[in-house]
Amino acid sequence: MNREFIQSIKYLFFRFLLRRQFLLGKENRFGLKFKFKIEDVVGRRIFKLGKYERDISDFVANNIEFKDGDIALDIGANIGWYSILLNTLMPESGQIYAFEPDPLNFSLLSENILLNKAGNIHAVNKAISDKKESKKLYLYSNRNLGRHSLLESEQGDGVDVEAVQLDQYLLESHVDLSRVKFAKVDIEGYEFYALSGATKVLDYIECLVCEFVPDRMRQGGVDPQDLINLLENKGFYPSIHKAGQLCSVTSAELLNGPACDIVWLKR
């Protein structure tokens, strides 16, 4: 029997017989551990498969190299999958800033940082926007706690969160923008607003992994082309994974295609 089958049986046992509220999933490459709300899809995949978002995670683990003093950003950190993965790649003198506005996700992120002794990570309980303001975070169901969004939604409850402009926050935190080399952004269609307030640090970022959900953006009143234009004007070009390989992609393909994770690299 393979791992997924065995872990799936265990998951059903813990969820429906023991009625556990939280579980611990173990990542199978670096031995990382993640506490998660038992219904949540991110944690379920880690628990059953020992991995999450395989293509992007493997790309990061195999291709991103940090030097002493480098900095990475995780915007929409959720329970910490990418932040803690980045921590394994980062020299002792490096830093990761992990932004997560949702109270439950932030609590789990903080626990997982301690669980993995990931001392390079600074967990920040704030959202990222184009200006400093109070925003409503629209909550998705417990089945996918990573689907919360700052884009207006008619479904689900909301919680008020503090949003900051990324450039301003980093400068006020005395972060050397020139040392920021990598960023991951996954905030359910709000990426354009977040990166509109990051034009200074984008000059230094060499690789940006960014979720792209054109239909959700349009529903929330955002033109997906604006995000593409913003990043291309900063010297980035987009690629996506196809059959395990990183392939270049056109704007038209992105605009007319499904949701995907884009790897933006500098020309």
Language model segments and positions:
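Phosphate/nucleotide-binding beta-alpha loop and adjacent structural elements of enzyme active sites
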Residues: 1-267
